[in-house]
């Protein structure tokens, strides 16, 4: 807070007009270290605003010396004439620059306190991310060679690997994603070695409960997956048993049984035969046939 108040009341009196963007850079580095601003191009634009003055980077707010310039060295390119001196209203110009990038952190006491709170939160996220990066490196380093390729593929699916080289400003979401990555990488470690490996990891204290919950959930999913695989194998074995080719004796016995079953069905359950009318067959009788006639 003292540094902010000092900067608000600061004026730069020098023959060399230091870029106000360097003052902005000091605040940005304090509040958001990961934010990358091209100070050099901003400095060149300020050279157009202050013609006749050499714009150089400011080393610090206290020394007021450019980078690489010894305090005892004299700048021959700058005249010692007092008329060449310029007073830059740093507080006003710094505020204008901050407003131009959508930031009004120096506008009030509450905003200054909010900037400090943001700085503390940012430092906490940076520390958490750093520890989780270490944990990821430890896990991958201890995996067998055959599993390192799978671990790399998992890492590339979950996050942009360019962020490992040039990390952006951290967020809560990014940190939680890293916790998820650590949990997934642990699934590649044999269960009997997980406990010892977890003890060597750098898990932030504030995230240990979440990490343990993620790890338990991953273990449950792993057990469920193994159970499903085991049930699938059992079903396959059962199907193979039913499809075995019977022996000759079994085939003969089954054939006889099927024949008896068909015969039984034909006798008992088949359609009943409809009785047909018997045809009278004429028989020849020798001699004259008697006539059965009754006379009245």
UniProtKB/Swiss-Prot annotation:
Residues 1-57 are annotated as: Interaction with REP1. The modification N-acetylmethionine is found at residue 1. Interacts with REP1. Residues 228-296 are annotated as: Disordered. Residues 58-296 are annotated as: DNA-binding, and self-association. GO terms for biological process: 2-micrometer plasmid partitioning; protein stabilization. It is found in: Nucleus. This is Partitioning protein REP2. Residues 275-296 have a biased composition (Basic residues). GO terms for molecular function: identical protein binding. GO terms for cellular component: nucleus. Its main location: nucleus. It comes from the Eukaryota. Residues 276-296 are annotated as: Nuclear localization. Part of the plasmid partitioning system, which ensures the equal distribution of replicated plasmid molecules to daughter cells. The plasmids exist as well-organized plasmid foci within the nucleus that stay together throughout the cell-cycle and act as entity during segregation, effetively reducing copy number to one. Plasmid partitioning requires the proteins REP1, REP2, and a cis-acting locus STB (REP3). The plasmid 2-micron circle is a extrachromosomal element that resides in the nucleus and propagates itself stably in host cell populations. It provides no obvious advantage to the host but imposes no significant disadvantage either at its steady-state copy number of 40-60 molecules/cell. Keywords: Acetylation, Nucleus, Plasmid, Plasmid partition.
